[in-house]
């Protein structure tokens, strides 16, 4: 099972969590989320999505995070990615979804926090690899550390 952390719980971060819960919960475990919004607000936003509807999971909040179904997710509120303790929660991969930390040097701050790899959800600068699904995604090498996958808009 791959353990991931999500930095940024806006639209992209929430959609990634929802996709994992609905399609990959036996393969991917979200162990932590970092976002400056309150735990209660973020729990509400994942439960009730204006486009995708209500998620079919019970969500409970605590002072440290929330529980979705049987899955506990730790929540941090750090502005600096270097201060997020990804290693302590066992996150192998961090999904960078803030739209702020788009270059290699800023993405590397997640590595300082204990993550092994970083995937940037927006077009990155000076990253090891940029994936365009259906164009070069088969060229992805597991040895890469900083990966950028520009967000696709499906209409």
Where are the predicted features?
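A short, hydrophobic C-terminal helix/tail in secreted or cell-surface proteins
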Residues: 147-155
């Amino acid at each position: 099972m791959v353990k991931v952390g999500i930095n940024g719980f806006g639209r992209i971060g929430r959609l990634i969590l929802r996709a994992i819960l609905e399609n990959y919960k036996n393969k991917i475990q979200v162990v932590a989320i970092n976002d400056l919004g309150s735990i209660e607000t973020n729990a509400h936003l994942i439960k009730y999505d204006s486009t995708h509807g209500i998620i079919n999971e019970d969500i409970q909040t605590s002072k440290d995070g929330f529980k979705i179904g049987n899955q506990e997710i730790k929540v941090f509120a750090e502005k600096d990615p270097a201060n997020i303790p990804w290693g302590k929660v066992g996150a192998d991969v961090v999904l960078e979804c803030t739209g702020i930390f788009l270059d290699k040097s800023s993405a590397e701050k997640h590595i300082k926090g204990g993550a092994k790899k970083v995937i940037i959800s927006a077009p990155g600068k000076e990253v090891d690899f940029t994936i365009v699904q259906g164009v070069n995604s088969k060229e992805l090498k597991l040895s890469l550390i900083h990966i950028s996958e520009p967000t696709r808009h499906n209409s």
